[in-house]
Regions:
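Extended, charged alpha-helical "arm"/coiled-coil substrate-binding scaffolds
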Residues: 1-176
Length: 176
């Protein structure tokens, strides 16, 4: 009995590790896809949009810092590249939505909520209540739109898949 449970534990852990790597790989791929488009097009942006973004980001950092003193200029300098990248992505994202006539339907939203409920059946009521709030539903819609945009972009991308062994990743992490 205990051998079975050890084997099943090993399989479960291995499955979770593989899924985690897949998810991290997918996230990195999507980020690289967006970054490649930003680099290729290098859209112009209003400096005021970056300032507004940074102002909100600094406020968030202050809230997370629990009132500890914070050097606004250091935070600003640190996050400036992130702010510029995100403002550029936002501009491109809107153009892609218009150009590709991309949209998230009510059916898409309902299907995603159902998927979340099925994955967390014990929290069904909380999930449904959470997405009744317009701001939460909007966040879900934005996430789905991001997926639709990335799927749209994939048709134009030349992707080379490379399989990397875990031991190779460990070796690279130790180089730093």
């Amino acid at each position: 009995q205990s051998l079975d449970s050890i084997d099943s534990l090993k399989l479960d852990v291995e499955k979770k590790i593989i899924e985690n790597f897949r998810e991290r790989s997918k996230t990195a791929y999507e980020r690289d896809l967006a970054d490649a488009l930003i680099e290729k097009i290098n859209p112009s942006f209003a400096p005021s949009m970056v300032e507004y973004y940074l102002k909100n980001l600094i406020e968030d950092v202050k809230k997370q810092n629990s009132g500890e003193p914070l050097d606004d200029e250091k935070v600003r300098d640190h996050y400036m590249p992130v702010a510029e990248r995100n403002v550029k992505w936002y501009a491109l994202r809107n153009k892609l939505i218009d150009h590709g006539k991309l949209e998230v339907s009510k059916d898409d939203l309902n299907a995603e909520i159902e998927r979340l409920v099925e994955a967390n059946t014990s929290s069904e009521n909380e999930i449904r209540k959470f997405y009744k709030k317009p701001s939460n539903l909007k966040r879900l819609e934005d996430g789905l739109m991001e997926k639709i945009i990335l799927e749209y972009l994939e048709q134009f991308a030349k992707v080379k898949e490379v399989e990397v062994q875990t031991k190779d990743l460990r070796g690279k992490e130790n180089e730093y």
